[in-house]
Regions:
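Short polybasic/polar patches that bind polyanions
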Residues: 21, 32, 61, 105
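Short alpha-helical DNA-recognition segment
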Residues: 24-42
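Sensory/regulatory domains in signal-transduction proteins
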Residues: 83-192
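DNA major-groove recognition helix of helix-turn-helix/homeodomain DNA-binding modules
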Residues: 50-72
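Short, basic/aromatic recognition patches
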Residues: 68-85
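A short, Lys/Arg-rich alpha-helix, primarily the initiator
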Residues: 1-21
Length: 192
């Protein structure tokens, strides 16, 4: 069942450190962008400080993936033009970046209504369980897994419907180095 109050399933400590590394950003620059001190950034990255309120909102915005209109245009076209049910989200915040028409039909919603909004609150129990496994699989780490296949059930939501079946998650980096997740629904025949 959908739990709208559930928090994003990411570790802001490791996410901030990874986002800074991928973008070549020093702690001092991140601190300046977030309106805090460099030691505060260091404490967040060590897990000693859990950001709340406006700092958390700014931090989520800083680490979120965004499709660049020119450099990521081909990827967006491939996703939106796909004949398969597929969508692309920020791997950190689960904000929708792009979706195919087939996915929109499954959801019974237009992607334009959801663009930039986090989809996490619509996650099925199986999707939540798969998300919890990612860190143990080395998701996003050098030498770790960058793809996961699992079976999901429905989410029980009329607001955004998840169809039971096989899902394939594939992690990729956008042109700015931010992590995105390609989510594809597949038939068993396709997966084998």
């Amino acid at each position: 069942m959908v739990d709208p109050g559930r928090e994003y399933p990411c570790s802001l400590a490791s996410t901030l450190k990874l986002a800074r590394r991928l973008r070549g950003m020093k702690q001092a620059h991140a601190a300046e962008l977030l309106g805090v001190t460099q030691p505060t950034i260091s404490r967040i990255e060590r897990g000693e400080l859990k950001p709340v309120g406006i700092l958390r909102i700014r931090l989520m915005d800083l680490v979120s993936a965004r499709i660049h209109p020119a450099r990521d245009a081909a990827l967006r076209r491939l996703v939106e033009g796909s004949a398969s049910p597929v969508h692309l989200v920020c791997d950190v915040t689960h904000r929708l970046l792009a979706a195919s028409r087939q996915r929109e039909r499954e959801w019974c919603r237009a992607a334009a209504e959801l663009h930039g909004r986090p989809l996490w609150r619509f996650a099925s129990d199986a999707i939540r369980a798969a998300e919890e496994r990612l860190s143990s699989l080395g998701w996003g780490e050098h030498g770790g897994t960058h793809a996961l296949t699992f079976t999901t059930g429905a989410n029980g939501s009329n607001e955004l419907r998840i169809v039971p079946g096989i899902q394939i998650w594939e992690r990729m980096l956008l042109s700015d180095g931010s992590p995105a997740r390609l989510v594809t629904s597949a038939d068993e025949v396709e997966v084998l």
